[in-house]
């Protein structure tokens, strides 16, 4: 196929990476962090320091830098979904940025930040709705001082069995199995077909996680 990009010679990789890291750590340059994240991503992809995985690491850098710059309060802003919707445009914009024309690339990047942010908000809303629905169903299913612990366990461990739940709650295996059977009966969990040592799945949460 046609070669669309050739990274700099490997002998220069360290120099360019050192310069990029210094730019990332410069907190007094007055550049808006979102614009700076766009430049950082473009520069990293141009340096292309690894044999493979540069795209994944470059997208991860966006999240880590925005977290470092306190634009987001946790380093979980992954751009892959938004970028994949216009992958050809993404590569074209990166190519134009390598000639020093950053305006189109930054504009594209900022628009994709909006798309990704809206997607994350939608996911969080769906997760909150699932939490409230599950809480209501659980309240109508079991009455126990362990209620909050069971609810937390479901959302932190959507695949579980009786032994695990017993350990988490500090209860007997028999009591844990009774809870799990009740949760299966209410539709919160789905158990496998085994008669003993069954594994239970919080399918609604697992499905939501796959769409994230």
Label the predicted regions.
Residues 1-212:
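FIC/Doc superfamily catalytic core
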